[in-house]
Every structure is written in structure tokens, then in C-alpha cells.
């Protein structure tokens, strides 16, 4: 999609951009970040992991950066018009941030969680995550988001 916007292709629809921004807000911010910020990070802090100047602080900083980039993407769509440069810059930065963030989660945060949190605490966190998905995100939302991704894959990744 980003390449289509950058190359000024007509098939990039402002509605698609709004949909992908909505996807990012729900899946990334309302679900994934909330799981970490409301449940995982406090549990890690109680287990002795530093927030400030530590791995939690780094992750929180990246969450903040991601929210700002999503905001910039959203602001690039005004009155059904796309400010292509703003969108492409913000989306490209977001992709790079996300890759870096996921690598930190996979190589540092999640292994650290496995070593610092007891099995019972991890079970409790999983239950909290499931409740969040059901009660905040809503039943069927993941399926809806998956269908949206399949649509975009067919449209933009040919």
C-alpha cells in the first residue's frame, strides 16, 4: 500500500488507508500495547525489572513513538485526500519502528518475562489478556481484522 501511495497509483483508496490506520489502532494500541502496559510491565516491575533506563522504559518509548506515527498517518488523510509524503514518511518510519520493537520483544522482553515471572503469574497474565481481547476488543474482531488483511494482500501484494 505504501508503495502505491508513494507512486501515486490510483488504486490506493483513502478508505483503505483509513482502514489500515483503524487496524493499527485496534490491534496494536488497544490490544497489544494495553496487554503490555497494563499487565506485563507492572508484573515485570514487581519482579524487579527497571522501568526507567531499562527494557520497560525502552518499550514504552517505542509505544509512544508508534502512537505518534499512527497519528501522523491519520492526519495525512483529510477530506478524502491523501498527503502522500506525510503518509509515506510516517508509514515507513512505523514499519521500521515495528520491526525493531518486535525484535526487542522476541530477543529480550519475552525471554526476560519467561525467566522472571512464575508459571502461575504467566497463567494469570494470559487470563487477563484473554479477558481484554473478549471484553475490550470484542468477539469476532480478530476475524474481522484478518479479513481486512487478506483483502489488502490481494489488492496490494500482487
Label for each model-derived stretch:
Residues 1-158:
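Small-residue-biased structural context
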